[in-house]
């Protein structure tokens, strides 16, 4: 049995992306881990590359080829086959720092935590130099201690999962992610909290909020573990005709976890930022097919509908950041 299980869902990733990702995993200082690669119905070329690269870079690994069912089902399948005490997820086009598993092991051996969070940093694809990034991360964040979260800390982290706003969970350009990445989750907890396969968008935030709704022991290491590579052809960076529908699905899933005034304000802050992004990424995009007049009417109609209107209480304004207040005046007033 391995101490860690690294689960990598893959769907038609490029060979170079996977090679960089797999290489960063093979360079881990701590070696007691297994790798489970879930091929979520990739084309034949990608499937062959997965098999070849897994054999090249990994010692203990398992490749599972399935039909395309989405990333949530792929991750759940990985959880099913994992044998490690703790599970961590890595996307097939990202890279991790060599100290990640060693850092986690040293803390988890000392404290019986359900979840241990590390730091993630976003890097644009055109700035990518894998060896340089890993070396900088290792030197810059050489020393770190675990911040064990009390009830107040867990509440702060819960709020952070709505809008990534809490300074306690940031360090330089690094931050605790709302995705499943850059964190170690006890296998028994992951098995009881599988990803919602019905959600096609916003499944990451929903999963994190659900995990934190459990009575858990958690800690945070303010050390860079993970590089999220922002790629131009990523689904998150392409024009989507279903942009509004997908974000409505995501925000609706998050709204279910609003439990008090503070989380309501964090939800409002997140919805305001989505509304801001809606203008350049959808209505003002060169691919938008409608007229500007139609866009104006549709946009202002959205503001009055759920989930965009949720949390839109004038009493919440005082809790927003300066940027949030400006966005509120622009989009909600």
PLM region spans:
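Short aromatic/hydrophobic "clamp" motif used to bind/position activated sugar donors
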Residues: 87
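Glycine-rich, basic loop-to-helix element that forms the pyrophosphate-binding segment
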Residues: 21, 66-82
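Membrane-interface aromatic/basic loop that binds lipid-linked glycans or pyrophosphate carriers
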Residues: 284-333
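Short loop->beta transition adjacent to catalytic acidic/histidine clusters or analogous donor-positioning motifs
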Residues: 2-5, 26-37, 58-62
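A conserved acidic beta->alpha catalytic loop
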Residues: 39-50, 91
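Catalytic metal- and UDP-sugar-binding loop of GT-A-like glycosyltransferases, i.e.
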Residues: 67, 90-92
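Donor-binding/catalytic cores of nucleotide-activated saccharide
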Residues: 95-108, 113-202, 206-218, 229-242
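Short, well-formed alpha-helical segments that are part of the catalytic scaffolds
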Residues: 13-27
